[in-house]
Amino acid sequence: MAKLIVNADDFGYSEGVNHGIISAHKNGIVTSCTVMANMPGFEHGMALIKENPTLRCGVHMTLTCYKPLLKDHKTIVDENGNFFRRPSEEVLKNIDLEEVYREFKAQIEKVRERVEITHLDSHHHVHGEEYLRPVIERIANEYKLPMRQSSEMAIDGVTYAKCLGNFYMNNVKEE
């Protein structure tokens, strides 16, 4: 078993991100990635995964970037059909958790059709948000995959990979 996992998230975001992650993997830095199934670079990323079978692949469940895979959502998208980048308190109060579940499941299944999934995490660490706990518990129990721990929230029966969250929180700045 690996003693250190270096995971690169946002795989599938764009061709540039994909090439950067593949380069880091080929140079012995990155050992796994998590894929954004809803992003424009997804197909490109899947082609690169086939060429690099030693790169383990998880799903980077996405609820705050670009567009959902499913088009019938009402509460998790704006008037243009895009995910809310930073949902307001009003939006959060009215989210239909069934929509979130169906979207996360669609993302997982899209990746699973192409590659063996090794683990789960999420864009902007939304899987650690308490309001999504019922959805994350349901996904965790259904798929039985290890999950990156992003908060103190723990779900019975889920294996967590601890991460250096302080590095992210203290060093990554969003504009």
Show the residue positions of the predicted features.
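Structural preference for beta-strand elements that scaffold enzyme active sites
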Residues: 3-5, 30-34, 54-60, 117-121, ...
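Catalytic domains of cell-wall/extracellular-matrix polysaccharide-remodeling enzymes
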Residues: 105-174
